[in-house]
């Protein structure tokens, strides 16, 4: 079957993203539980960055520049040069070289390399490397908008495990869940068996695979969820973002959940979006099986 020009572009982007995720995985496996150079991005020593974070991001960025020189790049470990107040490219690669750096440093094999591609702010492609049991090279879960989601070469389709939309299986929640959110009494009794992993991208992959029925994150950055959002949507799942709006004649803001379809801030047109805007993106999200996500959202508010 002949592909049109747009399909050819996304096929090339997808192949490169999957290749880079696998290459990142090789670097991660080669350096796991090995001596690392660790620095901290904050004065409190809570936000580490390793030489492997920097190495992987540099490798990914250079490869993208070589294949798609006109594409934009936004990485977690970027310097201030990336955050300049300038319009971004229509195609923007959003990368977290190691999501779960604390786990990686500690020797806990729960981490991910997340590579997302946005088109005019819309999540169009995602590839996430995952360390995987009984695998010498790990696995990559990936998706392209309109083409479905895959775990390595196997197509995945998210199924509802609860006909009532109430979770009875595993869910992943942030440690600050009860401090940030106010669940209803109904939700408290039906929230499921919760876990905390320390990697948002990893949790989104688990939700796309149906291992976790849904996940909640209170303030992810764009590089944490750009890839996972596309993957969950293409697997048949749902991703909601929490927004606060001040309505006319109201003193207090109203919090509500809505579909996450674009990362463009405040629904602005793409032409007005800058790399600096996107770097500052942070909103709470719920993601996973649609019925459970909707049930959770209808019973969950911010404090």
Each language-model region and where it sits:
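Residue-level detector of anion-binding/catalytic polar loops
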Residues: 70-72, 193, 213, 238
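Residue-level signal for inorganic ion chemistry
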Residues: 28, 53, 64, 101, ...
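Oxyanion/phosphate-interacting regions
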Residues: 1-19, 185-188, 202-303
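Short loop->beta-strand "edge-of-pocket" segments that line small-molecule binding or catalytic clefts
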Residues: 157-180, 184-198
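Short helix-loop capping/hinge motifs at secondary-structure junctions, enriched
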Residues: 148-151, 155-158, 292-296
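Short secondary-structure junctions
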Residues: 36-41, 149, 190-197, 239-240
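DPxDG-like acidic metal-binding loop motif
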Residues: 86-150
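N-terminal subdomain of lithium-sensitive/metallo-dependent phosphomonoesterases centered on the IMPase/IPPase/PAP
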Residues: 1-98, 297-301
């Amino acid at each position: 079957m002949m592909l049109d020009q747009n399909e050819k572009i996304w096929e090339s982007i997808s192949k490169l993203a999957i290749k880079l995720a696998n290459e990142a995985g090789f670097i991660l496996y080669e350096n796991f539980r090995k001596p690392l150079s660790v620095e901290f991005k904050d004065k409190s020593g809570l936000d580490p960055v390793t030489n492997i974070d920097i190495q992987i991001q540099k490798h990914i960025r250079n490869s993208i520049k070589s294949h798609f020189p006109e594409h934009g790049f936004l990485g977690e470990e970027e310097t201030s040069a990336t955050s300049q107040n300038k319009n971004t490219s229509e195609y923007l690669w959003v990368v977290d070289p190691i999501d779960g750096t604390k786990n990686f440093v500690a020797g806990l094999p729960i981490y991910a390399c997340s590579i997302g591609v946005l088109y005019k702010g819309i999540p169009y492609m995602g590839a996430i490397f995952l360390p995987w049991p009984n695998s010498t090279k790990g696995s990559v879960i990936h998706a392209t908008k309109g083409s479905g989601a895959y775990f390595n070469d196997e197509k995945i389709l998210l199924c509802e495990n609860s006909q009532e939309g109430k979770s009875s299986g595993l869910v992943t929640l942030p440690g600050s869940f009860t401090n940030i959110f106010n669940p209803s009494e109904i939700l408290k009794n039906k929230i499921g068996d919760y876990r905390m992993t320390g990697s948002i991208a990893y949790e989104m992959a688990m939700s796309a695979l149906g291992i976790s029925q849904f996940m909640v994150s209170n303030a992810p950055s764009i590089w944490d969820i750009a890839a996972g959002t596309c993957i969950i949507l293409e697997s048949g799942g749902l991703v909601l973002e929490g927004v606060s709006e001040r309505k006319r004649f109201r003193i207090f803001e109203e919090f509500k959940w809505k579909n996450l379809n674009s990362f463009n801030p405040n629904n602005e047109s793409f032409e007005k979006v800058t790399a600096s805007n996107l770097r500052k993106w942070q909103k709470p999200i719920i993601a996973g099986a649609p019925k459970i996500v909707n049930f959770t959202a209808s019973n969950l508010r911010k404090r």
